[in-house]
Amino acid sequence: MFGKGGMGNLMKQAQMMQERMAKMQEEIARMEMVGESGAGLVKVTMTGAHTVRKVEIYPSLMEDDKEMLEDLIAAACNDAARIIEENQKAKMAEVTGGMQLPPGMKMPF
């Protein structure tokens, strides 16, 4: 089924891909993305590991409706998480050469 050394080469390629994925995951975890809502009135800085580092709120919002502010903060967090997911997919495509993971399968395996 596998030619001479074929299985060994396949295993070596799999190991190399695994190492590249681990490095990519470390890079993503260190990255910081900024999500926004309310046309930039609320900004959330989040790491690739989904840790919120900073929340910025335009001063005039502090005097406005509390419920609206809560919604804007949640929307900014969701925007940052979406940006992180997009970056993870792009980085994964670099590592896998564009090969898509099966539906429902996420990194790390």
Curated annotation (Swiss-Prot):
HAMAP family: DNA_YbaB_EbfC (MF_00274). GO terms for molecular function: DNA binding. Disulfide bonds: none annotated. Homodimer. Keywords: Cytoplasm, DNA-binding. Its main location: cytoplasm. It comes from Shewanella oneidensis (strain ATCC 700550 / JCM 31522 / CIP 106686 / LMG 19005 / NCIMB 14063 / MR-1). One of its GO terms (cellular component) is bacterial nucleoid. It comes from the Bacteria. Binds to DNA and alters its conformation. May be involved in regulation of gene expression, nucleoid organization and DNA protection. This is Nucleoid-associated protein SO_2014. Belongs to the YbaB/EbfC family. It is found in: Cytoplasm, Nucleoid. Pfam families: YbaB_DNA_bd.
